[in-house]
Amino acid sequence: MNFKAIVTLFFLTILTSVSFSREVISFNQNWAFKKGPFTTDLLQYGNVFSGTWQSIAVPHTWNSKDMQVRNDRFTSNEKFYVGDAYYRKTFIPESSWNGKRIFVKFEGVNTNTEVYINNSPLPAKKEKGNVVYDASAINGNYQIVGRHQGGYSAFVLELTNMLKFGVENEILVKVNNEATPQVIPVNHTLFPMYGGIYRPVELIVTDKINIAVSDYASSGVYISQKDINKKSASINLKVKLENKNHDARDLQVVSTIFEQNGAVKAKNIKKYRLLPQGRQEVMQDFNLTNPHLWQGLEDPYLYKVVTQLVDGNTVLDEVIQPLGLRKFELRTGEGFFLNDIKYPMYGVTRHQDRWGKGSALSNADHNEDLAIIKEIGATTIRLAHYQQSAYFYEKCDSIGFIVWAEIPFVNRVTTLEEANAKQQLTELIRQNYNHPSIYTWGLHNEVYTPNAYTIELTTKLNDLAKTEDQYRYTVQVSGYNVINHAVNNNADIQGINHYFGWYNGVIRDVDKWADQISKDFKDYKIIFSEYGAEANPSHQQEVVGDVGNQWANPAFFPEEFSTKFHEIHWGTIKRHPIFLASYLWNTFDFATPITALNVEPRNYKGLITFDRKLKKDPFYWYKANWSKEPVLYLTQRRVIERVNEITPVTVYSNLGTPTLLVNGVEEKNFVIGETDVHYIFQNVKLKEGDNIIQVKASSKGQQFEDKITWHYLKDNPKAISKDGPKSNKNEHIGL
């Protein structure tokens, strides 16, 4: 059989299965929305559901704009709405679905959700972007389908026995984004809890005999890898099955591993008698020879695993999952090894919101973030501090990023959140089990007192993670800035968040700290899990000190301090192999419920602005250090107005030694800074008025150039003060 025939047969198989077994139907359009506060519960009987509702599509958050409103004092953002809101949608279940199973899958609803079905919805009509419901009718026929607590993981509810087929039904979703002591995160000050159905929704229609849909909203197929090398790979599939018929059925579970060109790599057929009670598991083993390994960004090769549930010649159900064959290993004091090859862990973190949209992001938004992260040269992403979009994990698989995935057990505890933390960890692992990009499960981040409770719960979460997935690492993160704290070291890896010069000490303290832990904890697996400093591009300062201005009133976050901070921190990290990986905080500015005077309500520690339009100077510092793409960049390009006649000029160049021209005259006096891409030209003299700063370099016959203009006056009324603060006694409190 030729290549074209193989590919055609493969895709015909897929199309046949989709047409006659499982159907997955987008459920994103034609929703109506109403936000509180409400004086009475809308679910009470009566005509309170009548009137005008906003016509919307999901993904949707009601906080897409009010999170951006600036307050006039350092406080919580009082304009940010938290409370109840409702979504409703009418739809007609097809008559052909009668006798099948019907599920609704929500990928993300923040935070507490109740779902109802109504078989006799109110009459309605659309008017100018709204949906108007008939006020003359009584509408109280709502039956509860189910509830979900937690705003970041997917959940599935079965509608099968609650629908009327061939006529209009209505689904109603009640959402509340208030903090509750039983649901993590219990503290909503670190990042905003955007309320709404902010990720896609879909209907799933299956046969009565099916691969499990509602196993914590997972695929129902779990692919485990062991003994992975260039010569062979051992694969185990666990397939969870359900039979809602009244009799047992003799079936075949057929799992096929396909190459990217459609050729069959391996196939396993297992006969199984499926009983009509409970959820049952079928195990299938594969031993592959000469596997094509998943090698991160260098070669993110993905097989496709197609699992079919077959009755005679009929495919009852089918699930398709990715397979990237790889082995992760963290070697203490050496680094991260991917398939026994040392692999650089250039790490960034990412929150899932952006200007004007909040958390209701499109695939195009995710793609833009991924493209920026790839541009900077990052190899690994910490998706903080919660489960993120399924699409984002899928793209990390196909691009080749190494991923740290975690639950939102952050900052504070109530001692009432244990059950929900376990639920969200189980959801995270089962829903993302098959992503080859994920190397570790995050258990907590900066969780403070009480110590005994935090230790106990973290230990339980670690045990749970190891029960769910014995093939990946677990990690916990400390905000106490020390390794040997009682709360630490209850997972495979200890992450440390430390912000030298921002929340405590001076920037250079990072050197002494790294030296000390390298000596005292040489046998520990340690990751520098967060470090960063705020940088507002509208705040510029010619010379900065050794500490930041995080508590300045009004707020003043000069970009230059962040640049200095990152130069020193990355230089230290690079020199200390005790750090098996590191993650700068953050790739992008993100919103925060805590606001400061004279700035928007957000955290400015990102290397890129909240709208993704401006890349700050530190972005190019990392790009020059990490990326294989050519970088030639002059820093302080936004400090145009200057008062220092004699000044350094900093250039980032991964092209070798650059040539610096100031007003056409070459400057030759330079030193190498924190790394070999860091060129600091010293004692450069400016003239009164405009100064043209130009840098040139060449590589492989190609010429590169960067140019900026500075305006110098001895008594420049537009310039910021010459110097910054030298000391700081404030401590990190988890903001």
Residue ranges and their predicted role:
Residues 19-21:
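Boundary at the C-terminal end of the N-terminal hydrophobic targeting segment
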Residues 225-233, 639-645:
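Short, solvent-exposed loop/linker segments at the N-terminal edge
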Residues 117, 230-273, 282, 647-669, ...:
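Beta-strand-rich binding/interaction modules
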Residues 8-16:
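Bacterial N-terminal signal peptides
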Residues 299-310:
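Internal, hydrophobic beta-strand segments that form the core of beta-sheet-rich folds
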Residues 157-163, 284-300, 681-684:
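Signal that preferentially marks extracellular ectodomain short beta-strand elements
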Residues 45, 55-71, 141, 146-148, ...:
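Extended substrate-binding grooves/exosites of carbohydrate-active enzymes
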Residues 25, 29, 34-38, 65, ...:
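Accessory beta-strand-rich segments of carbohydrate-active enzymes
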